[in-house]
């Protein structure tokens, strides 16, 4: 019987005293494999339940976004200016899933932006259509790679640097919220992601 990742993790703990550096590296890879497995499972569940929409609740979008920004402020480089443009209005959608998407977009922005700006804004585009926009002044994503970032398994990479499944998962969550997640191909000063929702 082959050992599970949890059993391997416990075994690795024994290296802490004799080889602390190796212990950290091995543990990081085990943790990355666990997350990769969880993400694959979630992708499968999302793909098989796209017709099942999430329950919606009414909430104040300004207060909601303040709480989201509070959760990511520790991840943002001190040289980065953070701004928001959120009106004090009520919307109706699934707050938990919206938070997941925004947190992922903002944390990605924090990783790649070490100076300049990160901005979160909200725009009403009609009676029941709105946009959440996350903009950063990081290096941006080459145009030829922009379509691929929402598709799983488009590149092989070191899992300790992330498995590349976060955006595909967010895109599927957006679909289940009767919305879409896209990148603005016209924006050239970094990256701009646009989440469109029916609210």
Language-model-detected regions and their locations in the chain:
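Short conserved segment of the HATPase_c
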Residues: 141-153
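Acidic ATP/Mg2+-coordinating residue in the GHKL
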Residues: 136
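Short beta-strand/loop element within the Bergerat-fold HATPase_c
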Residues: 117-128
């Amino acid at each position: 019987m082959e050992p599970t990742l949890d059993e391997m993790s416990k075994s690795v703990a024994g290296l802490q005293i004799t080889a602390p550096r190796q212990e950290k590296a091995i543990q990081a890879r085990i943790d990355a494999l666990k997350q990769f497995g969880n993400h694959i499972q979630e992708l499968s569940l999302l793909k098989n339940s796209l017709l099942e929409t999430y329950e919606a609740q009414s909430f104040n979008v300004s207060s909601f976004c303040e709480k989201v920004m509070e959760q990511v402020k520790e991840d943002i480089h001190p040289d980065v200016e953070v701004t928001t443009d959120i009106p004090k209005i009520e919307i109706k959608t699934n707050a938990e899933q919206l938070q997941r998407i925004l947190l992922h977009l903002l944390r990605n922005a924090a990783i790649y932006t070490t100076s300049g700006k990160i901005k979160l804004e909200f725009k009403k585009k009609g009676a029941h259509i709105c946009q959440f926009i996350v903009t950063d002044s990081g290096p941006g994503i080459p145009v030829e790679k922009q379509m691929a970032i929402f598709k799983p398994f488009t590149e092989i990479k070191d899992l300790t640097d992330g498995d590349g499944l976060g955006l595909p998962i967010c895109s599927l969550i957006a679909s289940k919220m009767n919305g879409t997640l896209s990148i603005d191909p016209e924006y050239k000063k970094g990256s701009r992601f646009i989440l469109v929702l029916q609210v």
